[in-house]
Amino acid sequence: MTGTGDVNLKIKEIEMSHLEERFFNFVKKLGRFNKRSMFGGVGLFNEDAMFSLVTDGRLYVRGGGEVDARFEELGCERFKHVKKTTIATVNYFDVTELFEKKPASLLSIVQEAMENSRLEREFKKSKENRRLRDLPNMQLTLERMVKKAGVPDVDSFLEIGAVDVFKKVNHTYGGDVDVKLLWKFAGAESGVHWTLLQEPAKQALLQQV
């Protein structure tokens, strides 16, 4: 029985290896990329911006902007990163079946994901020279609210993330904060106006609050 189990494990490892290799060759069509260890798997980076993840025999591509809605329409699920005591859902979508069955439809999505990740990295690199009120959707009033909640600057805001910033503000102001602030913080984090957030993205944010 053990021998059969070992053989099955070997076969699975070979299949996973072939899948990864085919995906890497697929992504090469869009330009050069680097590989680094991430989340127990391999992260794919273009110009130091991560746009894809390969782990446990599954392929994931980064969401963001209008790409989220396309992933939702195609039935792709978000990557769940299992930590010691919690499960964190991050904005990477499982494209394994899509890659196997409809690779042509995936190519433009991966290209857009690469571009989005580069733009966000550039945005985050420029954060050192920005005030909270300089971020999209933020003004002096919101800057004061966020600082009162214990988030002193842009660097901290982006590191903590929109959901947890909202939680802090909501707690500080007695749990009676307009949910629009969550959209505004999410837009500020992504570098877009909050009205551009798609409904699936809003629902995903709400589920984390």
UniProtKB/Swiss-Prot annotation:
Gene3D superfamilies: 5' to 3' exonuclease, C-terminal subdomain, YgaC/TfoX-N like chaperone. The keyword DNA repair does not apply. Disruption phenotype: Defective in DNA transformation. Keywords: Competence. GO terms for biological process: DNA import into cell involved in transformation; establishment of competence for transformation. Required for DNA transformation jointly with TfoY (tfoX2). Belongs to the Sxy/TfoX family. This is DNA transformation protein TfoX1. It comes from Aliivibrio fischeri (strain ATCC 700601 / ES114).
